[in-house]
Amino acid sequence: MNVRLFASRFVPKINFLNKSFGKKPFRLLDVGAGNHSATKIKSVFPSCEYHGLDLNKDYNNSEEDFALMHAFYEMDLTQLKMETIPNNYFDGIWLVHVVEHLYNGEEVMKALLPKLKPGGYMYIEYPGIKSTKLPSMYGSLNFKDDPTHVRIYSYQKLSNLFTENNCLVLGKGVRRSFGFIIAMPFRILAYWLSGKKLIGNIFWDILGFAEYLWIQKNPNQ
C-alpha cells in the first residue's frame, strides 16, 4: 500500500488528483503553487509533470520545490495574458483557494480552458457563501479574515459557466473531508498539547467553509 497516497486521501486537492488520474502519468498546472505544493504532490504522484503558477515566487517554496517543477509561470492572472502557457497541453488544472483573490475569476477560468486537453480535468476550491457567516478566527474561518479575499463565488453559477463552455460537471458542492472531520478532535488536542494557537482550517470541513467544483473538458472537443 502507498501510505502517502492513503493519508493524502484526506486532502481534497490530492484526493481529486487521485480520482482523476490514479496511477497514470499526467501533466498538471497547479495555479497557486505555494506552501511546498510541488513537493507534496510529487511525493504522492512521482510521475506527475508538475507546472506551477503564481503571482510571484515568494509563497513559501524552497529551491527543492522549484527543482521539482517542469516549469513555473509567474504572472498576474487578472491581466488574462497567458500566452506563455501552452495550449491543449495539460491533463489537469487545479485552482485551490485562488479565485477568491480574483475579481474576474470567471474570465480567468475561461482563459485557462484552452490550456487543458480534451478530456482533461479542472478542480476549483474556494471559500463559499457560508464562510461569510462563520466567526472570525486566526488562520481564516470567516471570508473577511483574509484581507486579500475580494469576491465570493458559488458552485451553482460556476457550474453554468463550465456547462456553457462545453465541459462536464463531475462534482460540486460544499467541501466535506470526512477524514479531516474525524481527525478534528485529535488535531485540536495536538495543538493544545504543543501550545500552538488553533487555526481556522481545522474547522473548515465540519462547518462547511469551502465549496468545490470538479469538471472535465468535453473529450470530443
Q: Where is each model-derived feature located?
A:
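Conserved N-terminal segment of class I S-adenosyl-L-methionine
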Residues: M1-N88, G92-W94, E106-M109, K172-V174, ...
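S-adenosyl-L-methionine-dependent methyltransferase catalytic module, highlighting the catalytic core
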Residues: R4, T78, G92, Y103-P114, ...
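Residues lining the SAM
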Residues: V96-V99
